[in-house]
């Protein structure tokens, strides 16, 4: 150890700066280095303070005039908590893009309400006009005649003209068909059937238009939630149509729901045209922060109109040559099979299997659609949260679609074994609710593998879904006629769900697919 007399000089030699007076009465003048640059010796003031004229050896911290805005995200996706989460939620709820999603949800609610009102009206109409059950089935299926091809045409129109314009024309046209149904039925049966065909043709553009608007208005990390909001309206339309139509009929006659729902459609078109823009860049009310957030979250090639446009004939052969396309077609077909079988036959199922009256059967059949609306939004939030936390888009879509297929498949087997209508309704609610996870699977995936052809892809897969819906609806009746029970058909539907899950998990992808190249 150094002698005590040498400790003070040793300490002075180790100091990087000149020692202040309290170290020694004699001030040493050592050069001060700041980032490798020699500075002149500092001027020491009394009490050991540096002269203000002497530069500090580090840059003083800068104080921001205002903190940067938090990264906008969906409810549940904010990494912060407390006040920050509330601020993010408030910004999201009041944002322009949520207004778009809400209006899309209302449009899809009207779409389904106008569709299912015939399911309620078919009984009094058959009695009033003397229709046989077989002809009543023809009337019910007339909607699908128009719906069979229109999604392909509508998808191409959406890709070229944009979702706002096509959706406006679609809602106006199907509302007109609904509104004119009483007038047509009073004059000619074929004229009445024509209004149903027109309804199907017009509603074929609804889902492609919804996909196009979500693609333009939402960043990739929020699209599942946006689709969840829109599809919640779609499912609530079933509930609205099934539950309100009998009430309206009791007060305004058989055709009361047709007139009222048609008028609501015209009102929606007026609000849509005046309050909603085709793209964020065309919106005068959107904040600069929200516009920047949406733009940064998208990776699209912009045109002068602000969005992607399809300026050539879609390469159908190229689209059909890729396995991800067939994964989408298969998923949409299976989704539509189960959807229309449940929508068309479950009231009859409860009446024939459990011998409940029609009113109770309607309630048992309507409740699952409420669950589908709720879980559809939950699935969207969960899906977006997975992506925001680093899960790949491909894996996220496969997880969501697996739940959306395996869940209903297992629940339908439980429905097959149910001994009471309450237990059966519980299994049906589980089946329909979990089915909504597919909205964050194949339905969002359309926008990801080919955003420039999303409308056409939706139309192609939707047409396959319509064929499957017709086949499933007719097949259910065939099983009942030949086997006297729905049970065999429910088992078949479960097996189809499981096989479709396997096909999806093997061939689906969340990455963009090259449909324009030569490879």
From Swiss-Prot:
Residues 56-72 have a biased composition (Pro residues). Keywords: Chloroplast, Ion transport, Membrane, Plastid, Transit peptide, Transmembrane, Transmembrane helix, Transport. It comes from Oryza sativa subsp. japonica (Rice). Coiled coil: none annotated. The gene is PHT4;3. The chain crosses the membrane at residues 100-120, 138-158, 166-186, 188-208, 229-249, 253-273, 326-346, 362-382, 403-423, 424-444, 460-480, 488-508. Probable anion transporter. Its main location: plastid. One of its GO terms (biological process) is monoatomic ion transport. Pfam families: MFS_1. This is Probable anion transporter 3, chloroplastic. GO terms for cellular component: chloroplast membrane; plastid. It is a multi-pass membrane protein. Residues 56-82 are annotated as: Disordered. Gene3D superfamilies: MFS general substrate transporter like domains. Residues 1-76 form a transit peptide. It comes from the Eukaryota. It is found in: Plastid, Chloroplast membrane.
